[in-house]
């Protein structure tokens, strides 16, 4: 599986480039979160990760646009994956607020059972903190059945549109069944058996043991893996976080397009599932011969896992 990550791309622009993506050897695309946002428009890179509810449609495209995209990718033998934000919702405009944004529905805002305690994680090595507290935004209480009902309703609508996979943002902050949180097992039971469908969650800077624990329920999107189950991971050389996030010192921002492409090619030589981040306003970052060669050469790796 060779996935192109298209954060910040309007759906109409993605449709226009599908043949080029296919020609580059990508068999799937991951698009920007489709939930309504607290500020609509081509703003900061992190805005798509501050949704206000669990509906479909924002500045990047409507529900009808999404259905059209899914049809167009299917025609080309490709798949569309949607980035899903369900660990938290948007905050008030002032920095550091853990209060829900005014646009969050009242039935969410005024239900105390919907939310995690209004405290941030201080120790990221403490699993209880990571899954129980907030990460700078109003955290949703995933253990609550009402919250899960809203999420599943949204995911079911995505499936009806023709979406063929979900990428769960901040999956590491949602606990495992072994930790008393019955979300990932329900996700797996509900969607894993759908034909040609992918479920994967973001677990970056996690131990091999933690990655393998999440791997029981889905594929794991991560930046490094040295375990025994490579078929359960999706590797990236660069992500939207490593390129844009000040908290990570934008550590890949200084890499040239060619450096990223060669790092990606190395991953394709070793792993069956990889993701390539399309740098903003830079078609050369994904549309270059090294990436095409990586995708085509990398298909041979499948033989090793069968």
Which sequence ranges carry the predicted segments?
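Short glycine-centered, acidic/aromatic-flanked micro-motifs in structured strand/loop junctions
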Residues: 6, 56, 170
């Amino acid at each position: 599986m060779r996935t192109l990550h298209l954060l910040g791309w309007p759906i109409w622009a993605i449709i226009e480039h599908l043949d080029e993506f296919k020609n580059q050897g990508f068999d799937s695309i991951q698009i920007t979160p489709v939930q309504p946002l607290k500020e609509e428009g081509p703003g900061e890179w992190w805005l798509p990760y501050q949704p206000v509810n669990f509906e479909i449609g924002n500045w990047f495209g409507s529900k009808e646009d999404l259905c059209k995209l899914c049809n167009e990718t299917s025609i080309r033998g490709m798949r569309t994956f949607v980035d899903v934000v369900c660990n938290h919702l948007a905050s008030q405009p002032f920095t550091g607020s853990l209060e829900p944004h005014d646009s969050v529905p009242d039935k969410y805002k005024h239900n105390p059972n919907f939310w995690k305690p209004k405290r941030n994680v201080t120790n990221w090595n403490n699993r209880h903190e990571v899954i129980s507290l907030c990460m700078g935004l109003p955290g949703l209480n995933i253990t609550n059945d009402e919250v899960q009902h809203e999420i599943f309703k949204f995911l079911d609508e995505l499936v009806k549109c023709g979406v063929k996979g979900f990428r769960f943002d901040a999956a590491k902050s949602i606990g495992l069944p072994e930790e008393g949180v019955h979300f990932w097992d329900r996700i797996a039971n509900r969607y894993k058996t759908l034909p040609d469908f992918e479920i994967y969650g973001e677990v970056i800077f996690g131990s091999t043991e933690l990655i393998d624990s999440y791997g029981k329920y889905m594929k794991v999107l991560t930046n490094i893996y040295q375990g025994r189950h490579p078929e359960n991971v999706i590797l990236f050389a660069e992500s939207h976080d490593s390129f844009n996030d000040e908290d990570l010192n934008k550590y890949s921002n200084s890499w040239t397009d060619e450096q990223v492409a060669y790092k990606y090619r190395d991953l394709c030589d070793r792993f069956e599932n990889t993701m390539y981040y399309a740098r903003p306003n830079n078609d050369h970052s994904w549309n270059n011969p090294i990436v095409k060669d990586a995708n085509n050469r990398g298909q041979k790796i499948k033989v090793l896992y069968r």
